[in-house]
Amino acid sequence: MIRARHRRSRRWSRRPRAGSVCALVSGGLDSAVLVGDLLRRGLDVQPLYVRAGLVWEKEEIAALRRLLRALRSRRLRPLAVIDVPMTDVYGRHWSTGGGPPPGFFTPDERVYLPGRNIALLSKAATFCALRGIPSIAIGILEGNPFPDATPEFFRALAKGVSLGLDASLRIRAPFRALSKADVIRRGRGLPLDLTLSCARPERGRHCGLCSKCRERAHAFRDAGAPDPTRYAAGPAAGGPAPAGALRASAAARARTTRVAPAKATRVR
């Protein structure tokens, strides 16, 4: 019985395609540079966005599509979007609109979304097994304090999904030893102005008041690179951080930094 079930399962997973990789993408700096890096290595890249029902996803997907259009490469496959709803699990949580997002000075350890990488990678693994994609790349960085972002977790999960899907899958975190500033330096030449890293974006602009905006602004500063980001308000835009304020005022909108549209970037 066990052998018969094992033979039948082979119909569901495809033979691995050498030289192909699935990149988990969010539209932010890390995943943008990850895609560019994989393309430069000569790999066929399948970008995959996992939609979980979080408040920033509509703006994030729009930014991601603009970014991928600018990365002109024959090895870049069309964006795939799959759903792993988490709103029923998280309930009234800041990530689902149940409250304001973490403020500008909130430490990274306090913005954890429990089980997020487990949900993303489990469904991504099924997606890859059905298409013969042998590995998943994720843009985890140095210093990530969360339990589902460790090398031990990735090894254990890869082993589990490979066993459960009867497929040989790898989970790769090539930026695990890099800071966000390192990633920005690595991504010079890519249209990083098209990326979005904000917990409460406003019509394509970064709010400038959340912890994601702080992390982004500080990373450009630490990289010694000009920050092309349009911030609506707050310290990232060169202004104060209003206590409890998350919506940009009319004056803050007038101060928004504008950047010229990015030209398409050919990744060889």
Q: What do these predicted ranges mean?
A:
Residues D30-A32, G143, K212-E215, P228:
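Short, electropositive, low-hydrophobicity segments enriched in small/polar residues
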Residues I2-L190, R247, T256-V259, R266:
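ATP-dependent adenylation/nucleotidyltransferase module used to activate substrates
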Residues M86-Y90, G204, A219:
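Active-site/binding-pocket entry motifs
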Residues R214-R221, A225-V259, R266-R268:
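Short Fe-S-cluster ligation motifs
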Residues I136, R200-H206, A225-A233:
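Charge-dense, low-complexity polyampholytic segments
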Residues F104-F105, L190-L196, E215-R221:
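A polyampholytic, Gly/Pro-enriched intrinsically disordered region
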Residues S122, L196-H218:
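Local cysteine-cluster metal-coordination motifs and their immediate loop/turn environment
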